[in-house]
């Protein structure tokens, strides 16, 4: 019986480590806060994790952008989206890129 319990524990541990999204990451949490409050991203963009349903910018769940693409768009602006280079630090831009790339690619 103990071997059975050990086996199930290992399966549980494996599933938690490799298949559940990591959301206790402080950079992830900072990025989420910026997305929702400071950057006003949620006003224009749809992202399930943020419970946002903006209709102006692209749906990030469908776009599934990587960090490089997000950093470029936030830093330089793209289309009707303005640049946030003067409003956010590079660390804040990287944090929001980290958050969006992980959330959109779940």
Annotate each PLM feature:
Residues 26-47, 62, 76:
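Sequence/structural segment immediately N-terminal to covalent heme-attachment motifs in c-type
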Residues 54-106:
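Extracytoplasmic electron-transfer domains, predominantly the class I c-type cytochrome c fold
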Residues 50-51:
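Terminal low-complexity/IDR "tail" segments
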Residues 21, 44-47, 67:
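Generic hydrophobic-segment detector
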Residues 1-29, 73-74, 87, 98-106:
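Post-cleavage N-terminal segment of exported redox proteins
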Residues 20, 40, 56:
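Residue-level signal for beta-strand positions within conserved beta-sheet cores that form or flank
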């Amino acid at each position: 019986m103990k071997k059975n319990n050990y086996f199930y524990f290992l399966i549980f541990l494996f599933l938690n480590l490799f298949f559940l999204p990591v959301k206790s990451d402080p950079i992830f949490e900072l990025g989420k806060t910026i997305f929702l409050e400071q950057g006003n991203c949620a006003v224009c963009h749809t992202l399930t994790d943020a419970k946002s349903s903006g209709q102006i910018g692209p749906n990030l769940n469908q776009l599934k952008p990587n960090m490089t693409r997000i950093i470029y768009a936030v830093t330089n602006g793209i289309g009707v989206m303005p640049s946030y280079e003067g409003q956010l630090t590079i660390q804040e831009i990287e944090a929001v890129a980290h958050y969006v790339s992980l959330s959109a690619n779940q």
